[in-house]
Structure formats: C-alpha cells, structure tokens
Amino acid sequence: MHLEFDKGGLRFFFFTAAIRGRQPLLSRIVPRAPKRQRPGEVSPEPPRRRDSCAGWGVELAPAGEAVAKLWREVHARDPFLTASNFVLMPDHAHLLLLVDYRRAPAGFDLLGWRLRFRDEAAAAASAMLPGIKPSAFWEEKYWIMILNAGTSLPAVRRYIKLNPARKMWKESHPDLFARHTDLRHPVLDPALPWSAMGDLTLLGSPFLFPVVLTRKKPLEQHEPEIADILDRARNGAIPVCGFLSPGEKRVLELLRKEPGTRWIRTVAHGLPPRFDPSAEESRYLAAGRQLVLSSFPPDVPEFPVNWPNCHIMNDRNAVLCVRAAAGAQSKR
C-alpha cells in the first residue's frame, strides 16, 4: 500500500483496526453512571476509565487498557506525533493520529510506524489474554483515511465520540436501523425503486410538505421561510427535504434542536446493502424522529454529488407530498 499526500505541515490520519474474528476483547459498552459526588467530596478510589457520550460509554478490558496506554504514550515516544481522539470498541479500534511533518524526521514512513504500533499493541494486549498469540490478535486488513482539518476532521471526531452510543442505539432499535427495499406505500410512486431506513410511520402523515431553499439566495434572505418551516414542524407537519443547500442545512440544524419535531431526509443516491448512517444521524433514527428515503437504485453512488439527481429528488418530494395530501382528502 502506498499513500500519496502533501507531507507539509500538520496532517490527520484516521485508523480503524479490528480484532481477529471480531472477538470482543478490548472493552464492553456500559451505561454512563450519573455523577453524584457532593461538592468538596473526594472519591477514595478513582472509577474505572469510561469514555462516554449520550448515555453510553466503553469500559476497557485489561487488553483494552494495554492498547490505550500505548496510544497515550505515542507523543512521549515520538514528539512529532500526537495521539488525538480514540475509542476502543469491544471488537475494533478507531484511532486519530496527528503528524507534524515540520518536525518529523526525513523519510518518516507512516505505514511502517502503523505496523510497529500494531505489533506492539498486539503484544501488550495478548499478554493479558492467555492463549491468544500477538500474531493472531488483529485482522490483517485495516482502514486509513487522510483527513481535511476543515471538513472531515470534525465529522470523524463526532463519529469517534458517538460510537459507543451508536452501537447501543442500533442494538436497541433494530427496526429503525433496518434497510427497507422495494418499499411500497400509497404516497410513493410504485414505478420507482424506493428504499428507506428509519421510522416508516412518517410516510403515513397527511401533513408532509416539501422544503426547497435555493443556493442562489444568501442564508439571511431565507430566514422568513425557515421560521415558517419550523413553525409548521412544531405543529406536527413533516418536512421532506434533501437538506443539501446552506438554507436547508440550517433548517435541519434547527429541527434537531426542537423536541418533538420529525422529518424525512431524502437522498439523491441509492441506499447500498451496507448503508451505514453517520453517528449524528443515528441519534435521530434511534429516537424515531427521522426517515432516510431514496428513490434511486442502490448502485447510484453518494459521491460525487449528482446535481441533476438532486433536482429529480426535489420533484419527487413534491409529488410525494401531493399524494399524501390527496390520500388524506380521500379518507374524509
């Protein structure tokens, strides 16, 4: 494997490695215990380390403690490296590494360093696990992503932070994380290959309404429309939108902050067999507040964004909402 990237300045790298056979050797997912310590009170014994978010965290097993210890020592051993955010899930690890190429020795080999860290972590962890050899600890395959500090880095940090909660959300609400294909519903055009993930009951609302906020207008000019959309959503109506333009993204941001609001997020691509929603999106799927809906075949890719498909999606959203209103009228 060979990586091509600019080796100047600061660079972030996101590694994912899995335990051989996906055995749960590193940690277990636990509820986050509320802190009940009185002011000025000192706990006689520090609690076992928990990295937690949204009510769930990981409690490290001895093997996980060994890997975490090595990760935290990275900077002390190599000052041009910084071990940033990480989470050790039961059967895999997500690690975010910062490399300062201004201070790195000439010819620093990132992949060679990764192999050395992998082997050291395997040796330290397997020492806590009788019967498991270091060579059999990790899967051979791994995943690496070179991050853009301005865009992908914040998303990866959120992903790491929410990973324990995301796992529990999916296990607690398998119906809301199931991928539905060949979907049929009175509001959906039967000629299209609909697929979805989330709360399908949203399709049954008679109060679906399409949202399209053009990129051609600055965000502040959309404020009256955004206020109206939020008011309708607070009163039980369901916005149907791709949430792609700056104005639409602002609507989604505000909807998420409004308890009780629900929405349908349509996408201009297919939902592949292993469609995996983001950690942030998983929060709202688990709460039954969102439906992800596609009218495209599963092999239509998400990237690069297909703008003609976005316009097709908006047109189909409008038809969907008309059918919902017509169905409500016919039942009266």
Which residue ranges define each predicted feature?
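Glycine-biased, small-residue-rich flexible motifs in mid-sequence functional cores and linkers
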Residues: 179-332
